[in-house]
Amino acid sequence: MASISCQHIYKIYPGATAPSVTDFNLEIQDKEFIIFVGPSGCGKSTTLRMIAGLEEISKGEMYIGGRLINDVPPKDRDIAMVFQSYALYPHMTVYKNIAFGLELRKTPKDEIDKRVREAAKVLDIEHLLDRKPKALSGGQRQRVALGRAMVRNPAVFLLDEPLSNLDAKLRTSMRTEIIKLHKKLATTFIYVTHDQTEAMTMGDRIVVMKDGIIQQVDTPQNLYDMPCNMFVAGFIGSPQMNFLDGTIVKKGDQYSVDLGGDLIPLPKEKTADGKLDSYVGKKVKMGIRPEDIDDEPEFMAKHTDCQLDTQVDVSEMMGAEIYLYLEYKGNKMTARVAPTSKARNGDTVRVAFDPHKVHLFDVETEQTILN
């Protein structure tokens, strides 16, 4: 069992004005693929390094497989780590690079050979075993680094931004390779990235962090559909969610968002619990994703109550879609529309959106109101 339990974990560096990681609580199941995601400096890599034993835990307790590991040396934690830099020995062949850690542990030669060749087969680098790192592409070098971790047969894989040095095309293919590798090895993976696309496409669950604090832990779909606050809503999704200034109004049993003259009626099934009663007359932030805004005639006809007149600042053709960068009463908005859209730079365009896709956030706390 390679479950991981992080209980009230803190990392406090000497002289720091605030903890780098604050009250980190997380239960990771055996064989789960967990992603730590957030902007630079949010504490994700520091947390990973505490799991690895490369950083001391300031407060709290950490368990791997039910065993307290706070004071266990990295070599005894049954983990393997893959870094952003491949850290391959340039004078050694691929075979020797993969085998090096096992040789240091005095593993029998026949066992080393078996593990190296098994890893090479899984990673499709059998034909590269006699080459030196300088003869390899970036993707091949990353596979060698993964192979070096694999042969240890660890209970937990820790991957710290392993694809950051690769170009966009190679990152896409390597994402797929790592997902396949996780399924083949059936071990616990913890993957750190600042790239929300990697997070959304790879993880069983995602831990979103900001300023050393967990913001939300959830499945990719739930993070997208039900963000707990404005930070998560804006960080997950590309282009990011639009935020408009509004005021909650109520007429009879109908709640609406007043966007400065344009009333957006909210679906009654989303407001029936009375959560909005305390917000009537108060300002809120209304969120709507770019993909939920459209100027297509059929969509417009379906959502006649949720339409806005906007000004097109920039129309960006992306091939399969167009990004419209819009201005609405001082608010900047982005819409992802079909390539058949006729909207162009400088045009006034009327757009609609699905009210069921509307998110509302408290102006002061930035927490979600409806979810």
Task: Tell me the role of every PLM-derived stretch.
Residues 58-61, 111, 211, 245, ...:
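Conserved coupling/switch loops of ABC nucleotide-binding domains, chiefly the family-specific signature
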Residues 60-68:
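Conserved ABC transporter NBD signature motif
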Residues 37-39:
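The feature captures the beta-strand-to-loop junction immediately N-terminal to the Walker
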Residues 74-231, 235:
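ABC ATPase nucleotide-binding domains
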Residues 254-311, 341-371:
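Glycine/charge-rich catalytic "coupling/switch" loops of P-loop NTPases
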Residues 5, 27, 63, 350-352:
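ABC ATPase nucleotide-binding domain
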Residues 52:
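Helix-to-loop junction immediately C-terminal to a conserved catalytic motif
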Residues 1-6, 12-23, 72-73:
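A short, flexible loop at the N-terminus of ABC-type nucleotide-binding domains that lies
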